[in-house]
Every structure is written in structure tokens, then in C-alpha cells.
Regions:
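Juxtamembrane C-terminal module of membrane proteins
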Residues: 32-50, 291-310, 333-440
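N-proximal low-complexity "stem/linker" segments adjacent to membrane-targeting elements
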Residues: 1-72
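Cell-envelope/extracellular polymer assembly enzymes that use nucleotide-activated donors
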Residues: 51-54, 84, 224, 239
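Short beta-strand-to-loop acidic/aromatic patch adjacent to the donor-nucleotide binding site
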Residues: 133-149
């Protein structure tokens, strides 16, 4: 029976089975993550002391939104004398600096067209703060994007995490424009999934989380030891996360500290941003992949699984999908031109491509539905739109396939993303109140 079975398997079948096995073996643990989050709840923390923090905001032509972020910091349920806000007006051609200064921030103007990117702006700010404001003895630095808005209890909740010993921590990343269109909704669902089914699970299991762009703090000890912000790949956040894990630093997660982020609404902006992310992930993989593999065996106990988890996060899994699709497409093309006469092999390739794409879409649909229902009350939108965007989410994720392919060959550069959604902390509080009242 087995002889007959194996005699009917072509080299195309063997290739596709191997790809499927690799994916299954590598990522099955994330299904356990989902189970962990649905079954167990993380106990809340308490703080014995309020700590002193510096906020660093890198802003490039962000006059339309930076004032809302600073205002949301100024109205925090946390002692204002323990928070100082610093804005880096990075290569601005508008009045971002004036708007930030009027809102109460200390502003540093930076002009440098050679070293472009958020990481360089952060390092510029850290160098000034550490040299000119050392007497204020900041215990940690918070990093936000200029388009963010914070829940009024954000600092109070993050302070609990810091007071309990965390050297770095990310927070709950919500979106302030989920219902702009299917693109912004796609981003929003992805970040909610990342918060709930990745970082929450990691927190429960006492392994390391990962920071993601904005809404995190880093202990001043780490910045001082590094001499500033020294992570300058296209995805400096992931590079920092990997570097921290390799050095035995566990990144925490605070699910009760809520941040609202603005998502792109045009496909062009979305393409540019996600191409940068894809290229950045490739860069981190090439620079740190081997060290993560080594860390899976050599790191101290309690930090080894974090190396594996982060390796799976940055490993170009999408690239493996692309290779599989291209391989099968070549087989189909050879069959269509008559260069390959084995009809069963060509048929196998056709079915494999359909199977691959259908399974990818189904997997993303299930993820979108699960995330939307579990986080239903956190999504500020109508029931109809929430349901509609469950069905568009798989198509949003499918667009990652060509983006990841282009990023592999294109000399991707950092490009600014325009932010124009004028939403303040009071607007978000009003939306939350409406959702709360609708339950009764």
C-alpha cells in the first residue's frame, strides 16, 4: 500500500508537502497562544511608587496631530510633575515645532538628510536629554508616534509594569480610525491580534514580548548602557526587541495601558509602509537570525524560547509562501508551453496554488473573526462595519504577498506617512461612553 502511494507522488508533491510541514512545525505554537489567552487571565499589578519619565516623540510634519498627543499626556491620571515631554521636529517643513511647543513640549529641531529615519531622531533626542537634562534623573523613556492619542490612565497603568521590575514594555495598541476604510481596519485588526494573541500570551507564559513601533517604554539603564538609541535598521523596533532578547532582557506587556494609533487610509501609503516593514524584517533576519538560533541553545534558561519565538516572528515565512507559489507557477507555465508533458504534475501544481491561497485566506479570515469578536468592545465602530471588515481582512493580508516580493529586491527607503485624523482624547472617551451605554 505504501509503495503504491509513494510511487504516485511527484517531486512537486514532495516539495509542497515539505513546505506545509515546515509551516506547521514552526508555527503550531501560536495556536497554543490563542488557547492560553482564551483560558487564562493575567492578574493585574499594583505600584508602590510613582516614577519619573521622559516622553520622546519623533515628528516630521505632524502639525495636524501632535497637539492631540501632547494634550492626552497633559491630562493623564498621573502626577504631571513626573512627566516631561520632548518632541524632535525632524526635518520638518511645517510648523510642527511651534504647535508642539505651544502644547507644552520641549522641542528639539533636527535637520539631517543623510541619516533619515525614526531611529536617528530618537538617538538625537536621547543624546540631548542625557547631556542637558541629566539632573532630572529620568527612570525610563516613553516613545510615541506623533499621531497617537493616549487613554487617560495610560501612564498610571504602565507605571505599574515599570514598578514591578520591567526594563521595557509595550502596551495595548488600538486604532483611532478603524472605520475609515478596509485598509485602516486591516491594520487595526492586525495590531489587536498582535496585542491579544501574541503579547498577552507571552505575558501569561512569562516569556518576552516585542515592541511594535510605538507605545512603549525603555528603562534609562538600557539607553545609558547602549549610549543612546543604537538600532537603525528599517524596523528599529523589531531590531531593539531582538537585541534585548539576545541580551537576556524580557520585554513586558501592559494590556491595560491603551494607545490609539492612526492607520493609513490609502493603498499607496499602506504599500510604502508595509514594504518598509517587510524589508526591515529581512534586514533583522539577516543580521540577527544566526544569533537567535544560537540563543535557542546558549541563552540562559527562561530566555531560550523567546529566541525561538522572535526567530519565527522575523523569519521570512511570507517568502517561503512566495517561493512555493512561484515554483508551482513555473511548473504550470512549462506545462502550458509543452516543455513538460506530465499532466499529473501540472495538475498537482494548479491544485497546490489554489490550496495554498485558499488556506492562507481561510487562516486570515479565522484570525480576523476571532480577533474582532474577542476585542469587540475595544473597536470603536458600528456592528455592520465590524462584520464587513472581517471579510475584507483576508484580502488586506493577501496584499502582503506582492509587497514582500518587491521588498526582497527593491532598495526600500524610509518614507514619511501623512497623518491627518484630528481625534483627541475627549473624542475617544465619548466614543467609549456611547459603546458602554449601548449595552444597557
Amino acid at each position: 500500500m505504501f509503495d503504491q502511494f509513494f510511487s504516485q507522488i511527484s517531486f512537486v508533491d514532495i516539495f509542497n508537502i515539505c513546505v506545509l510541514l515546515v509551516f506547521t512545525i514552526c508555527y503550531t505554537y501560536q495556536f497554543f497562544y490563542i488557547f492560553e489567552v482564551l483560558v487564562h487571565r493575567h492578574k493585574g499589578l499594583k505600584a508602590k511608587k510613582n516614577h519619573r519619565y521622559a516622553v520622546v516623540i519623533a515628528a516630521r510634519n505632524e502639525r495636524a496631530v501632535v497637539g492631540n498627543l501632547i494634550h492626552s499626556i497633559n491630562v493623564q491620571n498621573y502626577p504631571q510633575e513626573l512627566i516631561d515631554v520632548f518632541v524632535v521636529a525632524d526635518n520638518c517643513t511645517d510648523d510642527t515645532a511651534d504647535v508642539a511647543r505651544e502644547a507644552g513640549a520641549t522641542v528639539f529641531k533636527r535637520t539631517n538628510d543623510k541619516e533619515v529615519g525614526k531611529g536617528y531622531a530618537l538617538d538625537y533626542a536621547f543624546q540631548i536629554i542625557r547631556s542637558q537634562y541629566a539632573d532630572r534623573k529620568y527612570e525610563a523613556y516613553f516613545v510615541f508616534d506623533a499621531d497617537n492619542v493616549l487613554d487617560v490612565n495610560y501612564f498610571r497603568e504602565m507605571n505599574k509594569t515599570f514598578d514591578n521590575g520591567a526594563k521595557a514594555s509595550t502596551s495595548y495598541r488600538n486604532s483611532k480610525n478603524y472605520d475609515s476604510n478596509w485598509i485602516s481596519a486591516g491594520y487595526a485588526v492586525w495590531f489587536l491580534r498582535e496585542a491579544k494573541f501574541l503579547n498577552q500570551a507571552r505575558l501569561n507564559l512569562h516569556t518576552s514580548c516585542a515592541i511594535s513601533g510605538t507605545g512603549f517604554f525603555i528603562s534609562a539603564d538600557i539607553i545609558d548602557a547602549a549610549g543612546g538609541w543604537k538600532w537603525h535598521l528599517l524596523t528599529e523596533d523589531i531590531e531593539f526587541s531582538v537585541s534585548s532578547i539576545l541580551n537576556g532582557v524580557r520585554i513586558a506587556y501592559c494590556p491595560t495601558a491603551v494607545l490609539y494609533d492612526e492607520q493609513p487610509t490609502t493603498f499607496r501609503d499602506s504599500w510604502n509602509q508595509r514594504e518598509r516593514w517587510a524589508k526591515g524584517f529581512y534586514q533583522v533576519f539577516w543580521n540577527y537570525g544566526a544569533r537567535l538560533v544560537k540563543g535557542m541553545a546558549a541563552n540562559p534558561k527562561g530566555h531560550r524560547f523567546a529566541c525561538y519565538d522572535m526567530l519565527m516572528t522575523i523569519a521570512p515565512g511570507m517568502l517561503l509562501t512566495i517561493i512555493s507559489v512561484i515554483f508551482n507557477a513555473i511548473i504550470i507555465a512549462l506545462g502550458a508551453t509543452g516543455a513538460m508533458s506530465t499532466g499529473t504534475v501540472v495538475a498537482s501544481s494548479v491544485s497546490s496554488i489554489i490550496f495554498c491561497l485558499a488556506n492562507y485566506m481561510l487562516f486570515m479570515f479565522v484570525n480576523g473573526v476571532l480577533t474582532t469578536f474577542v476585542e469587540w468592545d475595544s473597536i470603536h465602530s458600528t456592528t455592520g462595519r465590524k462584520i464587513r471588515y472581517m471579510f475584507t481582512f483576508p484580502f488586506f493580508m493577501l496584499t502582503y504577498v506582492p509587497i514582500a516580493l518587491v521588498a526582497l529586491f527593491h532598495n526600500t527607503q524610509w518614507k514619511p506617512i501623512r497623518h491627518t485624523i484630528d481625534v483627541g482624547v475627549e473624542d475617544i472617551a465619548e466614543q467609549s461612553a456611547k459603546i458602554e451605554n449601548s449595552r444597557f
